[in-house]
Amino acid sequence: MKLLLDTHVLLWSLLEPGRLTTGVATALEDPANELWLSPVTTWEVLVLAEKGRITLEPDPFHWIRTVYTTIPFKLAPLNHEVAVESRLIDLPHQDPIDRFLAATARVYGLTLVTADERLLHSQAFSALPNR
């Protein structure tokens, strides 16, 4: 399975693994599955750190670089196709990060791993719920 981690699932998997369901934790640990990330997740992690909502040591930039060089994530590029799909996809809200992640899942044929109930109500893409 190709799993696209949303921001909270990424952070929980590394900082608070107890917040993951058994099913999600098992899926993330399964070597048969591919773990994918979007650049918008990197951006959102850095924004959360800048706002003081999370603490990443020694600093957010070093932390994120270390994560991406030690864990074999695949990059789901933010390209024109994803940008267009983010406006076409049927979601109940306009949050741009959620729209980019949902569109990325559709464009690349990925399963979005999320706890976001607003996203989990959509049938527009494949999702693995963390609830």
Predicted regions and their residues:
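Short, well-structured N-terminal submotif of metal-dependent ribonuclease cores
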Residues: 1-37, 51-66, 70, 108, ...
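General small-molecule cofactor/ligand-binding pocket signal
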Residues: 36, 76, 128
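Phosphate/NTP-binding elements of NTP-utilizing enzymes
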Residues: 45
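Active-site neighborhoods of divalent-metal-dependent phosphate/nucleic-acid chemistry enzymes
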Residues: 55-57, 61, 69-117
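Phosphate-binding/catalytic loops
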Residues: 87, 123, 127
